[in-house]
């Protein structure tokens, strides 16, 4: 059974760079897991940020980038803004289904 693990919470400050990661218990995350990242704002609105590991969705600011770091998928926010405070979920593809992580609550101290 695949399990996807994320940091439960991270804190950053405006203008700082922060990296959220997504780990798989089955081994290294690769491009074949097609990592997706989704943002949930406090109003419960979900926004797709990154698809297929590193493809930014249309309209997503360039400060959001996806990559593979070591054996994990990563979402990096370069120059965080207070509006980026949200819960971030990653999802990985395993042959025939998506498995979501539990989400990372990002606090941006303003």
Swiss-Prot record:
Output the InterPro entries linked to this UniProt entry: Ig-like_dom (IPR007110), Ig-like_dom_sf (IPR036179), Ig-like_fold (IPR013783), Ig_sub (IPR003599), Ig_V-set (IPR013106), IgV_Light_Chain (IPR050150)
Please tell me whether the keyword Repeat is annotated for this protein.
no
One Pfam family this sequence matches:
V-set
Quote the Gene3D superfamilies the UniProt record gives. Immunoglobulins (2.60.40.10)
Gene Ontology terms: cellular component? immunoglobulin complex
Ig-like domain sequence ranges: 1-106
Per the record, the GO terms for biological process are: adaptive immune response; immune response
From which domain of life does this come?
Eukaryota
The protein's UniProt keywords, in alphabetical order, are: Adaptive immunity, Immunity, Immunoglobulin
What additional remark is attached to this entry? Answer: This protein was isolated from serum or urine of tumor-bearing mice.
| Name listed for the protein in its UniProt record | Ig lambda-1 chain V region S178
Origin species, per record, is Mus musculus (Mouse)
